[in-house]
From Swiss-Prot:
InterPro entries: HTH_CRP, RmlC-like_jellyroll, WH_DNA-bd_sf. Signal peptide: none annotated. This is Anaerobic regulatory protein. The lineage of its organism: Bacteria, Pseudomonadati, Bacteroidota, Flavobacteriia, Flavobacteriales. GO terms for molecular function: 4 iron, 4 sulfur cluster binding; DNA binding; metal ion binding. Its main location: cytoplasm. [4Fe-4S] cluster binds at C1. PROSITE patterns: HTH_CRP_2. It is involved in the activation of genes necessary for anaerobic respiration. The keyword Transcription regulation applies. One of its GO terms (biological process) is regulation of DNA-templated transcription.
Length: 92
């Protein structure tokens, strides 16, 4: 579903709770982007993989699933591309 910006802006002006929720969501997205930039620029390969698995664990736990046992549905290549690492590095 796509909502034109003008409509969303008008509705959020009339509904303070909607505006607050939108700001919270946008803030979370910006924070996530900043964290990813830091991860890719400052961490070594092992730290990148550690943070990736930790974040997955935390997100699974927040959704009511086990934070300790979960299936990685991404391939090694996908994980490597996401983290800026080679498949060989991920495999080690």
């Amino acid at each position: 579903c796509e909502i034109p910006f003008e409509t969303l802006d008008d509705l959020s002006g009339k509904m303070p709770n909607l505006r607050q929720q939108m700001m919270r969501l946008m803030s979370g997205e910006i924070k996530g982007d900043q964290d990813m930039i830091l991860l890719l620029s400052k961490k070594n390969a092992e730290e990148r993989l550690d943070v990736f698995i930790y974040n997955l664990s935390r997100r699974f736990g927040q959704r009511g699933f086990s934070p300790r046992e979960f299936r990685l549905t991404m391939t090694r290549g996908d994980i490597g591309n996401y983290l800026g690492l080679t498949v060989e590095t991920i495999s080690r």
